[in-house]
Amino acid sequence: MSEIYRMRFTESDKEKKTKMWQVLVRHYLQQFVKKDFVVLDLGAGHCEFINDIICGKKYAVDVNPGVKDYAGAGVEALISESTEISVIPDNSIDLVFSSNFFEHLPDRETALKTLQEVRRILKFQGSIVLISPNIACVRWEFWNFFDHTLPFSHQGFCEALAVSGFEIKKVVPRFLPYTTKTRLPQSSRLLRFYLKFPLCWRLFGKQMLIVAEKR
């Protein structure tokens, strides 16, 4: 799959994505993270989120060893399956973040096992913040990417979280556009504008945002 990513994103694309992630973190996602939090980025990929978030301790978890090349200063990169992050103790993480990860899992059983593992490592009332394509919005476009295997709607994912021992705190069915290759937003300035006006989300959003808390 690493060859797919090399074909999909040029160096210019990666630079643009990094800048847009900086805006997304600083102008929206930071609100969920206190400065003393222990944060784990699940399926961290190029580490755009975890490198920029301000918190006390940072973990980047990915099955791809290449994650170590992208983890910035102060980020501990862990090579691990999402269903068994054995190096992380029980009840030790304040917040787990995951973006564009669950749709790559092979089946729903693996998704549920992953959520159970997330619950294990979270502190009591710790949170998971999830961004993922919403099949209710993106529909057939979901399959435009060869490595997408597991579609979820916001309703379906909330149900999976509930049965895994989480309480839903926030659901935005339409949050971000489906891909950075879409027409909007196409720059850091446009993204800042977009994040300030939820009406834009309803027009262009095809990815969901869900925040849930460990019960």
Regions found by a protein language model. Name each.
Residues 84, 103, 137:
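Active-site micro-motifs of SAM-dependent methyltransferase domains
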Residues 1-89, 95-99, 115:
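Conserved N-terminal segment of class I S-adenosyl-L-methionine
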